[in-house]
Amino acid sequence: MATIKEIKELLVTVKELESPIFLELEKDNRSGVQKEISKRKRAIQAELDENLRLESMLSYEKELYKQGLTLIAGIDEVGRGPLAGPVVAAAVILPKNCKIKGLNDSKKIPKKKHLEIFQAVQDQALSIGIGIIDNQVIDQVNIYEATKLAMQEAISQLSPQPEHLLIDAMKLDLPISQTSIIKGDANSLSIAAASIVAKVTRDELMKEYDQQFPGYDFATNAGYGTAKHLEGLTKLGVTPIHRTSFEPVKSLVLGKKES
């Protein structure tokens, strides 16, 4: 009779819920064997569910494949809302029908998984472009226009250039056909890939800024207006990376000028 360890090793090779191996092993009434069978079935079901989820996030891409297009770039940005730091956009062209396990809207990916999935995108993407627009430009042109500039910069770095753009809730003035998708990072794998690249890139930048400007907790809050960040603003004042067109930074700058 096979040991439970041997059965566990055998079950790892089973990829289908209908496998005859399950039928055979279910005759073994040892509780340890039954536990391993249940565990493996749950793992297979989870893989099937994940594959279906990824498949559903390729619906926009598949419509474009039918038109003969394969160089499809997903575009997304991170950092429209913070009080400090740049807005960062990424453009990513994935291979046809590429499915990266765990890839999703970056806001739905556990933080501990960010780097792993970022690396998987880096490894599998045909091309990646990153656009970074700093706080000074944001203050000059407004955050909406700055976001478009970041996206255009990211797209310009792609090689080969894309045949079509899938963009998260925005239209760009570019001579490339494009589709604007509401909640695109949750509905398109290409946009989700851009989302995680932009997120990790910006988070790393804000960690560097945390070293340059301690006291604002940038490494944790990424420039968003958390209690620690606002406390830092009150105690230490405005840094060169703060957006002076955003409140409460704007009022602090005006108050300093008037005093």
UniProtKB/Swiss-Prot annotation:
Manganese or magnesium. Binds 1 divalent metal ion per monomer in the absence of substrate. May bind a second metal ion after substrate binding. The keyword Manganese applies. It catalyses: Endonucleolytic cleavage to 5'-phosphomonoester. It is found in: Cytoplasm. One of its GO terms (cellular component) is cytoplasm. GO terms for molecular function: manganese ion binding; RNA binding; RNA-DNA hybrid ribonuclease activity. A divalent metal cation binds at residues 76-77, 168. Keywords: Cytoplasm, Endonuclease, Hydrolase, Manganese, Metal-binding, Nuclease. Its EC number is 3.1.26.4. InterPro entries: RNase_HII, RNase_HII/HIII, RNase_HII/HIII_dom, RNaseH-like_sf, RNaseH_sf. GO terms for biological process: DNA replication, removal of RNA primer; mismatch repair. Its cofactor is Mn(2+); Mg(2+). It comes from the Bacteria. Endonuclease that specifically degrades the RNA of RNA-DNA hybrids. Belongs to the RNase HII family. This is Ribonuclease HII. It comes from Streptococcus pneumoniae (strain CGSP14). The gene is rnhB.
